[in-house]
Amino acid sequence: SGTPNGQHGNTHEAKLIKLDGDKPNESVSVRKGETVLLNGSRSDVYVDEGGVFGGNATVKSLSVAGVVAPGNSPGKITVLNDFYMNGTGVYKAEILDKDHYDQIVAQSVQLSNGGNSSKLELVYLPGGTIKKGDTFTIINNNGSAPVQGTFNGLPEGAEFAVDGATFKISYVGGDGNDVVLTAQNDSTGPKAPNTGGENVAVNLAGTIVGVASAAILLFMAKRKSFGKK
């Protein structure tokens, strides 16, 4: 399959655009610097380099030169026909556990163009738990044809690690033509980012020590002054 042809519709200029409802005959273009979250259905979706497309959506076709990030952490995008990624495209997939992770469902899947492979960016969500042997079908290819191409640096059977979790990737998983990650070890998701509480505690302790030291010095100075009288 190739890049879908046709007129681009609904060109947006805002930074964040939220689209809801079903408009199956309306296409969407996601421009550089834009994030479009679609919770509903549209026709053809085009994601330019520098654009981000997400939400729980059903679309006729999806062409990605930017970033596709299904769901609202996590979720699913269903593509009724072709899912196409070019060399600058990035699939940002989030995983919480074996029952909660991002997925793209499509009738045909192409992950590279002219030798330039798209990229997989896997995110292990805080609070997640993964057991060895857990499988994650991040692309469910409903068509009969195999996946065309592979993600950059991840050939068939490659292993890679994300936040302590190691995965093996296959492009012939599931019923024979799905992109499936298999966990190679038990792991837990990363801790939530530090909100500054630890730094506050350290700074507060330092302040207390500083105040105490100042008080001691002041007391000793007064004693010396008193002794001279």
Question: What function would you assign to each model-found segment?
Answer:
Residues 14-28, 37-135:
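Extracellular beta-strand/loop-rich repeat segments of large surface/secreted proteins
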